[in-house]
């Protein structure tokens, strides 16, 4: 393999964020919550495999189309200036081709599911494509991101139970609010650059109330997940998981208190552990009732 081929391969890895799995994990945890809740324990193994692989593929596809949408802005933002497109390592048409390949493979997997899941997948694709452009038009693009990152929840219920009960939409709402909270932490890192470029974000919209609103969103997330536990008759392990997530949310508030870029980014990353704790609590609930 020559140097040019290696560089091109690395550029594709960077476009798909294979080297930065945090987004995949933040999408994966609520998907797993939904699968376990819908199945009342370990879900069907093929369904589990399809959703785990699908999460990886669609998160990568979302990152690819995001870089295409932001190709004229990323070079002016400190955090994103080194991405493949602003660096000229790949051409825009190559980025679109990679997105198409990832989306088509994902759709091929979805075709092995039932008709309700297939129907819901079209909305998932629409949300993935629309989100990157929202920061130009709406004051809180994180709302659309939250919908995109939560859409796997009704899809998981559809695939596992062929139904969309109330609890599916409660988990959807909890994850939507959580996504807005952690992506606001992420947006706090880029706030100054976004203001210069005229882009919109929840961090800009919330202004000096950002920390307080993040806290309210985190509390609402926990309360809704608490209601889910009550509706599903879940046991102590689940609530211990929620308590662990609550402790991490308090820690995140400490991290963002001075609004320093690196600390805000660390708070964002910490959400991976919060999602994992809720999932561990769910698994233990069904393993050790």
Swiss-Prot record:
Subcellular location: Cell inner membrane
Keywords assigned: Cell inner membrane, Cell membrane, Magnesium, Membrane, Transferase, Transmembrane, Transmembrane helix, Ubiquinone biosynthesis
GO molecular function: 4-hydroxybenzoate polyprenyltransferase activity
Spans through the membrane: 21-40, 95-115, 116-136, 138-158, 161-181, 213-233, 236-256, 268-288
Any one annotated GO CC term: plasma membrane
Enzymatic reactions: all-trans-octaprenyl diphosphate + 4-hydroxybenzoate = 4-hydroxy-3-(all-trans-octaprenyl)benzoate + diphosphate
Top-rank taxon: Bacteria
InterPro entries per the UniProt record, alphabetical: HB_polyprenyltransferase-like, Prenyltransferase, UbiA_prenyltransferase, UbiA_prenylTrfase_CS, UbiA_sf
Record-listed E.C. numbers: 2.5.1.39
Membrane topology: Multi-pass membrane protein
Cytoplasm as UniProt keyword: no
Alphabetical GO biological process terms: ubiquinone biosynthetic process
Tagged with keyword Iron: no
Cofactor section: Mg(2+)
Pathway entry: Cofactor biosynthesis; ubiquinone biosynthesis
Coiled-coil region(s): none
Family (UniProt): Belongs to the UbiA prenyltransferase family.
Annotated HAMAP family: UbiA
Function: Catalyzes the prenylation of para-hydroxybenzoate (PHB) with an all-trans polyprenyl group. Mediates the second step in the final reaction sequence of ubiquinone-8 (UQ-8) biosynthesis, which is the condensation of the polyisoprenoid side chain with PHB, generating the first membrane-bound Q intermediate 3-octaprenyl-4-hydroxybenzoate.
Stated name of the protein: 4-hydroxybenzoate octaprenyltransferase
Gene giving rise to this polypeptide: ubiA
């Amino acid at each position: 393999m020559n140097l040019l081929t290696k560089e091109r391969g690395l550029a594709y890895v960077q476009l798909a964020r294979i080297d930065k799995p945090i987004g995949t994990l933040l999408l994966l945890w609520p998907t797993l919550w939904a699968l376990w809740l819908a199945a009342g324990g370990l879900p069907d193994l093929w369904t589990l495999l399809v959703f785990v692989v699908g999460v990886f593929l669609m998160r990568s596809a979302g990152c690819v189309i995001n870089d295409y949408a932001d190709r004229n802005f990323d070079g002016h933002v400190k955090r994103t200036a080194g991405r493949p497109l602003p660096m000229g390592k790949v051409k825009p048409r190559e980025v679109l081709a990679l997105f198409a390949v990832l989306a088509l493979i994902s759709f091929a997997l979805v075709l092995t599911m039932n008709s309700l899941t297939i129907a819901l997948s079209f909305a998932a694709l629409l949300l993935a494509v629309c989100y990157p452009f929202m920061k130009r038009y709406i004051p809180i693009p994180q709302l659309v991101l939250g919908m995109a990152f939560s859409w796997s929840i009704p899809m998981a219920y559809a695939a596992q139970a062929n139904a969309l009960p109330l609890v599916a939409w409660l988990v959807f709402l909890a994850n939507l609010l959580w996504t807005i909270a952690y992506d606001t932490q992420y947006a706090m890192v880029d706030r100054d650059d976004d203001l210069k470029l005229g882009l919109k974000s929840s961090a800009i919209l919330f202004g000096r109330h950002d920390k307080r609103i993040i806290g309210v969103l985190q509390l609402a997330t926990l309360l809704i997940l608490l209601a889910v536990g009550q509706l599903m008759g879940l046991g102590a392990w689940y609530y211990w998981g929620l308590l662990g997530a609550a402790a991490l949310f308090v820690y995140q508030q400490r991290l963002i208190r001075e609004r320093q870029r690196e600390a805000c980014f660390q708070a964002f990353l910490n959400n991976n552990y919060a999602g994992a704790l809720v999932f561990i609590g769910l698994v233990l609930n069904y393993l050790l009732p």
